[in-house]
């Protein structure tokens, strides 16, 4: 078993990077890959950079060059579910683009031409994520739709648009749908496991910067427990 782990920012991958034994670092096309082992499991940790293009590029390189059996996307997200607070976890059941619109050609809002409207997370990986959650006391999680766009969602207008068109959304962020679409095209199982760094209807830019370290700690703990369970 080789596990690919993807985070966008240095803060989102730092904890896991420090746990990799015999780490080898490779920089390519703006992406940084850290390969080695965590608790005897082969892992490749990718710091992709922010946004959908960087995430898709990095995921394609990860899959084509390192051939992971599964991909886990980690990091932070903005909470949309009413029960979520900073530090809570979201597990993807499916992922969609919230900033794609080719409805003029008969596609659903968020659906790209020639692609499914939603990218379904792997059932086994979702189960493993929930098993990991059960072993982390005092960690609250919600499983559901995660929406992605190349924008930091911090205005009431954009929040309203997303809620209107994707009423079941539990969280938003800036890379997951690109990772999911790339995994779909390569036929590699994926799941998104992120922690909440800020919550809709609150001071987004300030709270994101303030609470990102807590989100990184929560999401990294989930991924580490998943690695143990996937041995």
From Swiss-Prot:
This protein's pathway: Amino-acid biosynthesis; L-methionine biosynthesis via salvage pathway; S-methyl-5-thio-alpha-D-ribose 1-phosphate from S-methyl-5'-thioadenosine (hydrolase route): step 1/2
SUPFAM superfamilies: Purine and uridine phosphorylases (SSF53167)
BP-aspect Gene Ontology terms: L-methionine salvage from methylthioadenosine; L-methionine salvage from S-adenosylmethionine; nucleoside catabolic process
Entry EC number(s): 3.2.2.9
InterPro entries in UniProt: MTA_SAH_Nsdase, Nucleoside_phosphorylase_d, Nucleoside_phosphorylase_sf
Molecular functions per Gene Ontology: adenosylhomocysteine nucleosidase activity; methylthioadenosine nucleosidase activity
Keyword Hydrolase: yes
GO cellular-component term (any): cytosol
Keywords attached to this entry: Amino-acid biosynthesis, Hydrolase, Methionine biosynthesis
Family note: Belongs to the PNP/UDP phosphorylase family. MtnN subfamily.
Known function: Catalyzes the irreversible cleavage of the glycosidic bond in both 5'-methylthioadenosine (MTA) and S-adenosylhomocysteine (SAH/AdoHcy) to adenine and the corresponding thioribose, 5'-methylthioribose and S-ribosylhomocysteine, respectively. Also cleaves 5'-deoxyadenosine, a toxic by-product of radical S-adenosylmethionine (SAM) enzymes, into 5-deoxyribose and adenine.
Designated name of the protein: 5'-methylthioadenosine/S-adenosylhomocysteine nucleosidase
Source organism of this protein record: Vibrio cholerae serotype O1 (strain ATCC 39315 / El Tor Inaba N16961)
């Amino acid at each position: 078993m080789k596990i690919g782990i993807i985070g966008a920012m240095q803060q989102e991958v730092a904890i896991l990077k420090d746990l990799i034994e015999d780490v080898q670092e490779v920089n390519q096309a703006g992406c940084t890959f850290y390969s080695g082992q965590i608790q005897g499991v082969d892992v490749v940790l990718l710091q992709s950079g922010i946004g959908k293009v960087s995430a898709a590029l990095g995921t394609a390189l990860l899959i084509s060059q390192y051939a992971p059996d599964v991909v886990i996307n980690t990091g932070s997200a903005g909470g949309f579910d009413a029960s979520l607070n900073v530090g809570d976890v979201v597990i993807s059941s499916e992922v969609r683009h919230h900033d794609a619109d080719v409805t003029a050609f008969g596609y659903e809002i968020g659906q790209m031409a020639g692609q499914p409207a939603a990218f379904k997370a792997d059932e086994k990986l979702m189960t493993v994520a929930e098993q990991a959650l059960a072993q982390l006391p005092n960690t609250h999680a919600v499983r559901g739709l995660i929406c992605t766009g190349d924008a930091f969602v911090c205005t009431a207008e954009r929040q309203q648009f997303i809620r209107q068109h994707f009423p079941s959304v539990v969280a938003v962020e800036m890379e997951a749908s690109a990772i999911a679409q790339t995994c779909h095209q390569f036929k590699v199982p994926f799941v998104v496991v992120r922690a909440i760094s800020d919550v809709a209807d609150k001071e987004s830019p300030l709270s994101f910067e303030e609470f990102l370290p807590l989100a990184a700690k929560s999401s990294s703990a989930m991924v580490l427990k998943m690695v143990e369970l996937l041995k």
